[in-house]
């Protein structure tokens, strides 16, 4: 309480490195501070955010078609709110069902979770999950500004990767792919930086090429 050290006190550990990679995900606590302090988003469009819900269902065999992919846009949202869904038929009679809604919606009474539940009442969705059971669920924030909102991803002694930078490609619905690729390019960049003394700015060039 008074700031006095007890016998069990352990000082914090200093982790030192020539290059630090920040990979905290969407709007990471440290990442957003770095973007602000180093003005990494100067001249870029404002970032956009969304919330995504995902459920894993085990459905009846007659409703399952392994490999089937379904994407939708709009309903049940109105014309002033953007969002859409995905459904992937996986193996073992499982489907991955989800809905994403932009967080710039104007209606203060809109509940993204309730809209997702309403979406599941659509006949095309209801007939697939009817008789099945939900076995897992989750939600996460998404960074959706795209290429025009992508900040500089390098700064002195550090790199941003994945959603900490905003690498999600919304038009192609590619998030994990671009995040992993940014990590691979970050590793290549650090290797060249340490071995050949190349500037960390090559990370941006490599990622955008």
Please report, for each region that a protein language model flagged, where it lies by residue.
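FAD-binding beta-loop-beta segment adjacent to the flavin cofactor pocket
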Residues: 139-170, 201
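Alpha-helix capping and helix-loop boundary segments enriched in small/acidic/polar residues
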Residues: 44, 107, 149-152, 170-178, ...
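Domain-scale detector for complete catalytic domains at protein termini or as standalone homologs
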Residues: 3, 132-133, 138-142, 206
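Active-site-proximal substrate-binding core of FAD-dependent oxidoreductases
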Residues: 166-172, 184-209
């Amino acid at each position: 309480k008074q700031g006095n050290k007890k016998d069990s006190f352990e000082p914090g550990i200093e982790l030192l490195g020539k290059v630090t990679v920040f990979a905290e995900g969407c709007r990471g606590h440290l990442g957003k501070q770095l973007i602000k302090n180093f003005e990494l988003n100067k001249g870029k469009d404002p970032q956009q955010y969304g919330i995504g819900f995902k459920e894993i269902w085990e459905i009846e065999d007659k409703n399952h078609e392994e490999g089937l992919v379904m994407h939708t846009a709009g309903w049940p949202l109105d014309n002033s709110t953007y969002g859409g869904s995905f459904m992937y038929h996986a193996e073992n009679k499982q489907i991955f069902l989800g809905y994403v809604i932009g967080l710039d919606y104007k209606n203060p009474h809109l509940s993204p979770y309730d809209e997702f539940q309403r979406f599941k009442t659509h006949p095309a969705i209801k007939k697939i999950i009817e008789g099945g059971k939900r076995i897992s669920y989750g939600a996460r924030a998404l960074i959706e500004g795209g290429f025009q909102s992508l900040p500089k991803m390098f700064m002195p002694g550090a790199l941003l990767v994945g959603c900490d930078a905003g690498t999600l490609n919304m038009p192609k619905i590619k998030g994990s792919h671009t995040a992993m690729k940014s990590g691979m390019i970050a590793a290549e960049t650090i290797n060249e930086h340490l071995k050949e003394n190349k500037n960390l700015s090559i990370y941006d060039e490599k990622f955008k090429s």
